[in-house]
């Protein structure tokens, strides 16, 4: 059942990559992509629920037929690996980058073909990099955004300095944390500093576009892009939840034993749920947003472009 559903998920993901592989992505096609992501997320919810049925078995019940599964394992599922690669999972982010050795030549070739094509992550990143509206000849949103960020951090520091209820050592530690956070924000506006951040995969331009979409999501032309990014993150989270529930079930059934495919069992699965995420940079943009009451107002020129031509 899982293989059939993963085949459907792969079909949906490939159709979304076809949409974003075009030089220009029409708004109605973004709506199509959102609908397909919703379908993927409903499938994941079903897959996660099915673990509850499997867990009605006891460990001894599972042991009665476990040996008949050997050496078959989800660890060896070529389709699952193709799905991960199509989404954009890098070999460097895999818990076991030698997984190809467990595949037969025909399946290894399928994986090679998938890896030779632009992943969904790459295509979404390129789409975000083309996002307009952030700057015009007379206006730069990022200058206003940077001023708000700097003022926010300075206010936080001043509040701490004047808070006599917090012991001085703790105040100093909190101020140091704010300083480090500010350094991270400053890297958003400096390509050289941004390139030195090793835990971010998404490009600077794509990250800035994601922030802009998230802050001004209520404007008509940004509503669908925001929904798309939101459902993309939801899919990544569902994938992570599926891995986690898989690891919990495996731990319950076999404890610390080796998995049927030769992996380290529940320990391996638990590690994949933490490390093997694809769209975590989009999710982390939430930590770069600012309160609505301090979001810089956009000039009328940009507001007009982001709004419908005719509004009731």
Residue ranges and their predicted role:
Residues 2-312:
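Surface-exposed peri-terminal alpha-helical interaction modules
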């Amino acid at each position: 059942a899982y293989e059939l559903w993963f085949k459907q998920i792969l079909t949906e993901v490939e159709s979304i990559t076809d949409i974003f592989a075009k030089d220009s992505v029409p708004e109605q096609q973004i709506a199509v992509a959102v609908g397909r992501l919703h379908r993927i997320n409903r499938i994941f919810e079903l897959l996660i629920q099915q673990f509850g049925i499997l867990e009605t078995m006891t460990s001894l019940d599972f042991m009665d037929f476990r040996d008949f599964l050997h050496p078959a394992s989800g660890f060896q599922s070529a389709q699952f690996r193709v799905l991960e690669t199509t989404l954009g999972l890098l070999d460097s982010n895999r818990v076991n980058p030698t997984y190809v050795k467990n595949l037969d030549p025909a399946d290894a070739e399928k994986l090679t073909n998938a890896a030779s094509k632009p992943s969904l992550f790459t295509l979404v990143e390129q789409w975000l990099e083309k996002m307009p509206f952030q700057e015009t000849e007379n206006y730069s949103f990022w200058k206003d955004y940077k001023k708000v960020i700097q003022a926010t951090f300075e206010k936080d520091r001043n509040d701490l300095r004047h808070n006599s209820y917090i012991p001085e050592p703790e105040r100093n530690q909190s101020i140091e944390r704010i300083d480090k956070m500010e350094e991270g924000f400053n890297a958003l506006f400096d390509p050289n500093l941004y390139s030195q951040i090793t835990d971010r995969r998404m490009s600077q331009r794509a990250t800035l576009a994601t922030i802009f979409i998230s802050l001004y999501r209520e404007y008509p032309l940004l509503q669908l892009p925001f929904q798309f990014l939101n459902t993309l993150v939801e899919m990544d989270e569902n994938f992570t939840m599926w891995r986690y529930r898989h690891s919990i079930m495996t731990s319950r059934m076999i404890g610390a034993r080796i998995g049927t495919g030769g992996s380290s069992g529940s320990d391996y699965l638990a590690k994949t749920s933490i490390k093997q995420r694809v769209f975590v940079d989009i999710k982390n943009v939430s930590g770069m947003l600012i309160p609505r009451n301090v979001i810089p107002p956009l000039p009328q020129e940009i507001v007009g472009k982001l709004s419908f031509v005719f509004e009731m």
